[in-house]
Every structure is written in C-alpha cells, then in structure tokens.
Amino acid sequence: MKQIQHELIMPNEDLPFKMFIFEGREGNYIREKHWHRSIEIFAVFQGTLEFYLNDQEYLLGCGDFIIVNSNEVHSIHAPKENMTVVLQMSLDMFEKYYTGDQFICFAHAPQAQDEQLMEMICEMYMVYSDKKCGYDLKIQSLFYDMLYLSLIHISEPTRPIS
C-alpha cells in the first residue's frame, strides 16, 4: 500500500501565498495522492484535468476551478496539455474566521461567482508574469478580494470531528 504524501507549502518570496503554473502543464502527468495544511485552488484556463478529491472524481475543463481544503487527500491526472494556475494559501489567513468549535470549509460544487473568481485569478497571474512596478500591491489587492468573495460565497462553516 502506498503511503499518502504530505506536501509542505512555502509561499513565493514576494507574496504571502504561492502562485504558479501547474507542473503537469505538458500532459502525461500524474500527481499521486497527497495532502497539506494549506488551502489550494486549481484554476484551469486551457485543456482539462482529472482531479480526485477524497476519492471523488472531478473533471475540470476550461473555466473551471476547484478548491482543496486543508488536510483533504487529493490527486491529479493531466493526460493532455493544459494551462492551470495554482494558488496555495496558508490556513492562517483564515484564522480569525474560525473558533475552537467551528472551522471553514470551502464547497466543491459550482457557484455563481465562479466566473468572477476565474477572472481574478487570471488577472493575478498576468500581473505576476509582467512584474511591472507595484505588481505585488495589485496582486495582493486582487488576492484579498478573491479571499473575501470565497469566504462570503463559497465557505461552509463546519464543526470539527470529535
């Protein structure tokens, strides 16, 4: 039996989170089951991904994204070329929004705000790629707007398992 890997997430040097192009962009790629304490967003802009989250399959195409909650076991299969932006953020960013008996969990079902979130992620990545003067401020502005939208429209309060 294969052991499920724990992935340690480190933010970009110039941002309070990690943003990058998915390493399986050339296709023919499998990322085995793993987990981390961070919250992760996979936003597909071209191509498709087969995403497995808690043993449930999600087929992601252009314009789709999925949010992986902290400690959720997931794996990814990218059979063909794709353009997917990945955001990884520390759970600490949401610390003041949960208490000892209530945690934040993000829904996996499609939401009305999906298009707006995809536009924000796209703009964040384009600004980051250009790295013009003040890029970090613009990215952080978009990032915090995205967090707000996610918190208000996509989060579901949950209780810890006793």
How should these model regions be labeled?
Residues G100-S150:
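Amphipathic alpha-helical segments enriched in hydrophobic/aromatic residues interleaved with Lys/Arg
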Residues S70-M93:
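Ligand-binding loop in jelly-roll beta-barrel domains
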Residues I152-S162:
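Single conserved hydrophobic/aromatic residue that forms the stacking wall/gate
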